[in-house]
Structures are given as structure tokens and as C-alpha cells.
């Protein structure tokens, strides 16, 4: 991906790798959930094995894990995050949405909430 690429440009390029099943909204949504689960599972397994822990909202690695291994794990997490991004944008495409429109709409919603002091709370329409 080139520097300065827009969300829509990424979406267009990434979706060139789609198979016909990418048009299926249910399939894309369920795979998105699956990809998020894969990332969570990798981190959970590192925690279970004592190789990682979360402290003060940061993912930390145990002393016995060498620097090279830490870098490998971080790269694996990043690859999974990339799969999540691809799947999310695939879902957008199946829905007929442009990624930039989704992002701008979300920022507008957040700015409106902030202007009314409603960032914290429950529900989309607060």
C-alpha cells in the first residue's frame, strides 16, 4: 500500500482479490467476526502460555520471550489486523458502502456527541 492512500483506494485495490462469495453479506460479516477472533485467540494463547500479559491497558511480553520472538509475534498480530481490515472493507463493499463515507459519517457522529457532551453513555442515538 502506498503512503497517502485513501480508504477508498485501499478498498478498491483490496477488493480486486475477492472471490464471488464476497458479494454475500452474511459470509463477509461472519468472516469479519472470525478474523477478529483469530487475533484475539493469538493474544489469548500468548497470555495463557505466560508469554504475554496486559498491564495498564498495554500488551506486554514476559522476560523469557526474546526480542526477535516479540517482533515476530507483533508482526503476526499486525497480519491478523490486516485480515480484519480486508474483511471489514469487504463487508462495506457487499453492503454497497464506500469506506471514506463510513469514516466521515462516524467522525460526524462523534463530533456531534462531543459537542453535546455525550461521548460517554449507551446506545448509538445518545
For the regions a protein language model found, what residue spans apply to each?
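Flexible "arm" and connector segments at domain edges
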Residues: 1-126
Amino acid at each position: 500500500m502506498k503512503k497517502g492512500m485513501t480508504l477508498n483506494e485501499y478498498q478498491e485495490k483490496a477488493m480486486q482479490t475477492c472471490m464471488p462469495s464476497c458479494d454475500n453479506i452474511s459470509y463477509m460479516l461472519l468472516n469479519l467476526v472470525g478474523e477478529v477472533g483469530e487475533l484475539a485467540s493469538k493474544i489469548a494463547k500468548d497470555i495463557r502460555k505466560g508469554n504475554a500479559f496486559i498491564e495498564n491497558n498495554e500488551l506486554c511480553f514476559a522476560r523469557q520471550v526474546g526480542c526477535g520472538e516479540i517482533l515476530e509475534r507483533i508482526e503476526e498480530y499486525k497480519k491478523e489486523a490486516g485480515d480484519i481490515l480486508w474483511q471489514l472493507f469487504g463487508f462495506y463493499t457487499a453492503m454497497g458502502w464506500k469506506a471514506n463515507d463510513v469514516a466521515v459519517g462516524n467522525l460526524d457522529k462523534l463530533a456531534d456527541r462531543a459537542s453535546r457532551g455525550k461521548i460517554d453513555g449507551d446506545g448509538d442515538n445518545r
